[in-house]
Structure formats: structure tokens, C-alpha cells
Amino acid sequence: MSTRTPLPTVNERDTENHTSHGDGRQEVTSRTSRSGARCRNSIASCADEQPHIGNYRLLKTIGKGNFAKVKLARHILTGREVAIKIIDKTQLNPTSLQKLFREVRIMKILNHPNIVKLFEVIETEKTLYLIMEYASGGEVFDYLVAHGRMKEKEARSKFRQIVSAVQYCHQKRIVHRDLKAENLLLDADMNIKIADFGFSNEFTVGGKLDTFCGSPPYAAPELFQGKKYDGPEVDVWSLGVILYTLVSGSLPFDGQNLKELRERVLRGKYRIPFYMSTDCENLLKRFLVLNPIKRGTLEQIMKDRWINAGHEEDELKPFVEPELDISDQKRIDIMVGMGYSQEEIQESLSKMKYDEITATYLLLGRKSSELDASDSSSSSNLSLAKVRPSSDLNNSTGQSPHHKVQRSVSSSQKQRRYSDHAGPAIPSVVAYPKRSQTSTADSDLKEDGISSRKSSGSAVGGKGIAPASPMLGNASNPNKADIPERKKSSTVPSSNTASGGMTRRNTYVCSERTTADRHSVIQNGKENSTIPDQRTPVASTHSISSAATPDRIRFPRGTASRSTFHGQPRERRTATYNGPPASPSLSHEATPLSQTRSRGSTNLFSKLTSKLTRRNMSFRFIKRLPTEYERNGRYEGSSRNVSAEQKDENKEAKPRSLRFTWSMKTTSSMDPGDMMREIRKVLDANNCDYEQRERFLLFCVHGDGHAENLVQWEMEVCKLPRLSLNGVRFKRISGTSIAFKNIASKIANELKL
């Protein structure tokens, strides 16, 4: 086994003092001679109440996994929200570390408006921090759960962006290998952001890859057959499954277990819904071709009639990456005001070091989606120069000035400016804080319960993050929205309801044939044609089955045969890295995951939840560890009463306004206070414990403490934008989708609003 060069030793309290090498690793850059004066003026002073990493104030934990967690954070210098993936390197073996740094290297070279952007990499002796773009709109998966299938016009807009981004990866000789609905995120303007490059790899023309990974319902037939492949063709098949899913709301290939699913994929037969257009059907036939040689390429598919319908004068073409704009004087002047010198700015940007300087420059060029329209004209509200209580800082940010939600914009349109290009005009009146040279130690990160509600106000925008990447399991996609799972009796109009509902799939590792000539040698982080990747099982991918009929709800969240799998040549007892979550925002706070193994594909769910670790089986699954509630046998701090002091504090509070009404479960013209009383009444009637976090926000728990039926969720009364109505927002924090649907539907149906 190859060994990686020992990592440089870094003081855990100086996590921001790093510059990056091209291979994704870091070296320490001493800034002690420059830090003194700036630290005195820094907004993140040593007495800062909230924990922070480098220049980022941590708001809350939005995902957890075996070896990593994801935190929602705010960049102190610019006020932009980011997602930080915190990976414990001490739990990874050398092979896993190679894969981790390969993923980082790949993300550094990707620069497309529909791919989640990496801003900064911070490395210490024990920990790797990936600072990434926060996609506040959540997952496409959750959008489909809430709305059912998309109309073809909407699906086309989304799909054009997806094809543009994947084709861009292919032209850079990168294959994603884990394309699925939960790895497609939406930003504040409902544009696609592809996430999770944990399974990605570089390919060469004429070379073959042999790592069998992906989510079974989206996996190409050659992967089920154990054949070697070039690379792009497996992504093309997955795109066909995604297109079918967008248009129909269900999967083209599904089964009660992995064996049945495999048989259906290898047959290549799928049902064409009556409402699907002929052009869309013909396009699917170019994607879902059993013979990979005859499968269409994305360059060919970009010219397809369905893809370009309504865009005749704007035919989808391969994305031309614009030259990086590293000389935006307005941004540079702002950074000089923060305390950076012209020389170090030019040095960092010319080499794209992905250090704190690169991150600050990129973030200054991005639209501030957090700024409230009412604050946008007030320079005093935008000023971050003075140290203020965190609640004041965050409450000055709220809705985006762009109240009108733009539907997806075609990728082939003139690409909007984003991080690496001259970003939107930066108001000259905005005063930015001096840079900070302080950071919290890793020990601060052990605080799992960092609450962002009171500290961040409405800055989070009600959006959370969603799990998807293998290593993090339920803590992988940092960008899941607050969209409740669909109820069994869907309230979505039948004309827009999919024939099959959406259910999340678990991720697992599938072992492959072991041969004597297969060695676990990774050279330069690449995979040889005889070397399969080795990853820990993933823990939260999605499956799609009917949400309307109970007999078809076979796979709740965590079902193994609905999951991302990864080929492995032999048993490994050391922890292997499956890749950190790819996008910067994760929704519910997932509990840590551990590994279990099971041999067959029958009764997968029961084996998944087994508390035993089986090391002699062929398939590996991840099971959920007990939550804090389960370990203690009770919910700490649960209360059904609101203190008088709390009432006084919140007397003037008003419900926050959500930009997206599709995450609302119930709407009413009732007074928000009366709605809260009704909610508490129904929760009491259903034996739910709850804690009032804010005047209009409840943290709820239901179940007897067992992993199978314990559900935690939030209920919040929110104002619907531009309407004289309030709504109740349901957001699942933990528990299976089926258990959440059951209790959420029951409560929603009993509310008299």
C-alpha cells in the first residue's frame, strides 16, 4: 500500500494559517508577524462568544457522520453563508486520505455555475476543513417530494443545467459516478448545483475504470455486470434516470430488493407515462441504452430536439469556462481595507491557493443572498465594521432583495457572473471588518448543539442541508431545504402528482470478486484499471417509490437497496473515506453512523437497523447510532411550557417571512400566536414532547426512544411572502421518512387553522 507523505504539523488553534498546494494539501504559512494589529481590530476577537474556524463563525451543526460533520457558518469578513465540512483525518487510513485529497483536487479545478464551488481548504494535523458554497434551496429530491413531477418545461430548464455541468466535467476528463436526485441542489434562484464529488475520478481516453460505485437505481447496467468502463457513459445512463425522475416523479427501474432491481436494469425495460411527450421519450432512448458503446454522448445530446425546445435561438452548447478574473480592483481595495496587502492578494490569486485570501476574494464576488431588501439601502445596516452581538449581525441579513424567485435559467444562456468572475457590484458604502487571526480549537467543534436560531435570526433562510455523501452518511449534502416528506394521501393536485413517490435510499458498499492481482495501491490519488476505490458505506441516498399507496412504500430512508454502493476487493477493518459531503449545506442534523454488514438483498432494512456489526458478510450497511435522546432515555430540556420571561422577550417578535412557500404544510389567516397555541394543543394530544426555541419555533420529539420510530422535527409559524397569510413549516431533524410522514401528517390533519 502506498503511503502518503506525512502531513505538516499545524497548531490546532491556527487553522486559518494555511496555503494550498495543487494536490489539495496544505502547508503552514506563518502570519504571526502580521496578526497582532489585525487581531485587535477583528470582529472575531479572542473574546468572541461563538466558536469559529479561521474567518468563519459557526452557526450550527447541520450534518454528522462517522468521520466528519458539517457546519453552517458565516464568513466574518463578508457576511456570506458557507457550509464547512470538518473531516477527522485521524480516522482515515492512507488510502482513504489519498481519495480525500483527490476529491479536493478535483473540486479545485471545477469552475461552473451549476457545480457547488469550493472556496477554501484549511488543514491541521488532525482535521481537514472544506469551506464550500451553501445552496439554500435544498435538494431536487426534496422538491420532487413536495411537488411531485415537474412539467416538462420546468424539467427542461433544470436538465439543461445538469447536462451543461456534467458535460463540462467530462471535457475536463472528470467523471462524477454518483449522479442522483439528492446530489442535485438548488440555489436561492432555483438554479442547479451539482454536489458530492466523493466518488468522482479522472479518466483517460482509452483507459478503463473498474470501481463499481453509485446508487443502484441510477447505476448503469455495466456496473451491475462488473465490467470495466471508460467513465462518461456511466454518467450518461444516470442522467437518463434523472430525466425520467424529473418528468415522472418516479424511477424507471425499481424493485423490492437489489436482485429485482438489478434484473430490471439489465432488461432495460421501463414504463413510459402517458403524459410524457414523444420528444422526451425519444431523448430517454438515447440515454438508457444497455450497450454503453451505443449510448449517446452529451455533446450529441446537447443538440437534441427536446433539450432545445423553446430555446431554438439558444441551443445548448458545451460550457466555455471564462478566464478567471483575479484583478477586480473593487474587491482588492476592500480586502486591502481588511488588512491584506496587495502583494499577498496577488500571490494567492495568481496561484489560486484556496486559502483565506482566495476565499475572501471569491466570496466578495458572490451575490449576497442573505441581505434583506429592507436593509439593502441602508449602509449602516450593511456595515460589519464594528463588533456587534451576533444576533445583531445576523439579524441584519434576511431575505434576498430578489423577492421574485427566478425559475431555472438555461445553462447555455450568458453565464451569470459568479465567484471567480467580476461579481455583482459591491456597494462602496459597505464597511467590512478587519481580518481575524484567531480561530477556535478543534475541541470547540465537539459542541454539537450550536444553535443558530437566536444567533442567526433569519439569515439561514429556513434552509437546512441534506445528506448524501458516503463518508458523512446522513451528513453529506450541505444543502437540503426544509421540505417535508409527502403525506400518504398527497395534497398535491393529482395532475402534478407522480405515479410513484420519493423515498430516500441508504448507501452501502458492495464487495466485488477478489482476485490475486488486485492490489489496493493508489498512485497519485488516481485509480488504476485494476484498483477499485475503497470507501466506507454511504448512508443517505434516495429511493423512489409510491407515496400514495402503502404497499409500495417499501423503502423508508435508510433502505439498503436504494443506496450508493461502492466496489471493494476485500474486507477492510480500517476506516475508509467515502468522500465528504459535497455541497455546502445539509438539512437535518443527522446522527453519527456506524457500519454493519449483511450478506443478501432480502430483508435489507431489518439488517440495516441491526445493532450487530457483521464483518463476514458481502454487503456493508451503515446503521444509525442512538441519538442523545436514546442514550439518555429522555429529551434534555423538553418542556411544554413557555416561561413568562421568554414571553416578555418575544412580545414584539413577528414570524419570519419565508421566500419559498413550497415548504409550507398548512396556511391560515389566524394570528400567529393563536396558531402556536393550536400547534401546542395538537402536540399535547399526540403525546409529543417539545421545546419552544423561539416564539414561533418549536423543536418536537415523538417516539419511545428506539431508532426505528424516534422522530425529531421543527415546527415554525412563518409569514408567506407578499400574502396576508401565515403558514406552518415542518422540518425533519432526524428519524425515518416514513415515521416523520406519519406523525407530521397526523398533526397537520388535526390542526384547526
From Swiss-Prot:
It catalyses: L-seryl-[protein] + ATP = O-phospho-L-seryl-[protein] + ADP + H(+); L-threonyl-[protein] + ATP = O-phospho-L-threonyl-[protein] + ADP + H(+). Interacts with MAPT/TAU. Interacts with DLG5 (via coiled-coil domain). Interacts with STK3/MST2 and STK4/MST1 in the presence of DLG5. Interacts with YWHAB, YWHAG, YWHAQ and YWHAZ. Interacts with PKP2 (via N-terminus). Interacts with CDC25C. Interacts with KSR1. Residues 391-400, 490-513, 521-548, 584-600 have a biased composition (Polar residues). The keyword Mitochondrion does not apply. PANTHER family: MAP/MICROTUBULE AFFINITY-REGULATING KINASE (PTHR24346), MAP_MICROTUBULE AFFINITY-REGULATING KINASE 3 (PTHR24346:SF1). Coiled coil: none annotated. Keywords: ATP-binding, Cell membrane, Cell projection, Cytoplasm, Disease variant, Kinase, Membrane, Nucleotide-binding, Phosphoprotein, Serine/threonine-protein kinase, Transferase. GO terms for biological process: intracellular signal transduction; microtubule cytoskeleton organization; negative regulation of hippo signaling; negative regulation of protein localization to nucleus; protein phosphorylation; regulation of G2/M transition of mitotic cell cycle. Ubiquitous. The modification Phosphoserine is found at residues 42, 368, 374, 376, 380, 383, 400, 419, 469, 540, 543, 583, 598, 601, 643. ATP binds at residues 62-70, 85. Residues 374-385 have a biased composition (Low complexity). The gene is MARK3. This is MAP/microtubule affinity-regulating kinase 3. CDD domains: MARK1-3_C, STKc_MARK, UBA_MARK3_4. It is a peripheral membrane protein. InterPro entries: KA1/Ssp2_C, KA1_dom, Kinase-like_dom_sf, MARK1-4_cat, Prot_kinase_dom, Protein_kinase_ATP_BS, Ser/Thr_kinase_AS, UBA. Residues 1-36, 370-600, 632-655 are annotated as: Disordered. GO terms for molecular function: ATP binding; protein phosphatase binding; protein serine kinase activity; protein serine/threonine kinase activity; tau protein binding; tau-protein kinase activity. Residues 56-307 form the Protein kinase domain.
